[in-house]
Design a protein with these regions (language model features):
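Acidic-leaning, charged glycine-interspersed low-complexity segments
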Residues: 47-52, 103-159
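Mixed-charge, glycine-accented linear interaction segment located at domain edges/termini
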Residues: 170-172
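Extracellular/virion structural assembly segments
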Residues: 2-20, 67-69, 77-120
Length: 172
């Protein structure tokens, strides 16, 4: 069931859980993503997530500024590679496939990059609570995880406001 995304500047996006929940929500609401995970994608059991493509969220680093929190985010969108067989006969069902090969790698890379573009574009322009101030670096992969997954990884820094409330702790 899709979750509602509310444009709420009152959400404290400097909290780790709120950043994770934001990306989990937009990934679950994307029409092409079938399952969403968190953490190191090397540990994902591909038998536990039979629905593809899958989205994965990982916060790799965090730094505190004077009034900001900056998260280094890695989003991965991956799909399971499938072998393709050219079963058409030349006389009845000839097709011109510009990138035909033994698997669907080009299709997976095209689709997963488009999904990452959707997710990062929405994050850049649709949310008032944080900003992506630098370029988003996307890297394709195919044999990186030794589990038949292929797709793209996007890395970027997400900056949020952090008021660092000093009234929360009293020292004696």
């Amino acid at each position: 069931m899709p979750q509602q995304i509310v444009h709420n500047t009152g959400v404290n996006y400097s909290l780790y859980y709120n950043v994770l929940n934001y990306f989990k929500t937009i990934m679950r609401n994307h029409p092409s993503i079938q399952s969403v995970t968190y953490g190191d994608i090397d540990t994902i059991d591909d038998k536990s997530y039979p629905e593809y493509p899958l989205g994965n969220i990982l916060i790799t680093d965090t730094s505190f500024g004077t009034s900001t929190t900056t998260f280094t985010i890695q989003l991965i969108v991956a799909d399971k590679q499938k072998l393709l067989n050219n079963e058409s006969s030349g006389s009845t069902n000839a097709q011109t496939i510009p990138f035909y090969g033994v698997d669907d790698m080009v299709d997976i890379h095209a689709n997963t990059l488009a999904i990452l573009n959707d997710l990062t574009s929405y994050t850049q322009r649709g949310v008032a609570g944080f900003e992506i101030n630098s370029d988003i670096t996307c890297t394709p992969f195919s044999d990186r995880f030794d589990n038949g997954l292929a797709g793209w990884s996007a890395n970027f820094e997400l900056t949020t406001h952090n008021d660092k409330n000093r009234c929360l702790f009293f020292f004696n």
